[in-house]
From Swiss-Prot:
Lipid bilayer topology: Multi-pass membrane protein
Coiled coil: none
A Pfam match: DUF3561
Alphabetical list of InterPro entries matching this protein: DUF3561 (IPR022721)
UniProt keyword annotations, A-Z: Cell inner membrane, Cell membrane, Membrane, Transmembrane, Transmembrane helix
GO CC annotation: plasma membrane
Domain of life: Bacteria
Sequence ranges on the Periplasmic membrane side: 44-52, 107
Annotated source species: Escherichia coli (strain K12)
Transmembrane segments: 21-43, 53-75, 87-106
Cytoplasmic side: 1-20, 76-86
Entry protein name: Inner membrane protein YgbE
Length: 107
């Protein structure tokens, strides 16, 4: 014999909980746009010679794109959906990651 009680559900009881707001799409867009801005910064600083540098190192910079998107999602959710703060912090964070990779590849 088991020592348990039967659980009865009535129509008043709901099994669904209140869903939290998701911030993945705006954060992903912010992360991708900040990756594009970070990709353009070496071209603005060093000019057209950067394209020859990117010919050999494009896989490294392409690998930063999903990282930038995840950083955008994470920072947007940490900022409780405040778009202005998440844009600023994502741009700074992705720019630092991009700059660190660029300086590491330059030697």
């Amino acid at each position: 014999m088991r020592n348990s009680h039967n659980i009865t559900l009535t129509n008043n009881d709901s099994l669904t909980e209140d869903e939290e707001t998701t911030w993945s799409l705006p954060g992903a867009v912010v992360g991708f746009i900040s990756w594009l801005f970070a990709l353009a910064m070496p071209m603005l600083i060093y000019g057209s010679n950067t394209l020859f540098f990117f010919i050999y190192t494009w896989p490294f910079f392409l690998a930063l794109m999903p990282v930038a998107v995840v950083v955008g999602i994470a920072l947007h959710s940490l900022m409780d959906g405040k778009l202005r703060y998440s844009i600023v912090f994502t741009l700074v964070t992705v720019g630092i990651m991009f700059g660190a990779l660029f300086m590491w590849l330059l030697g």
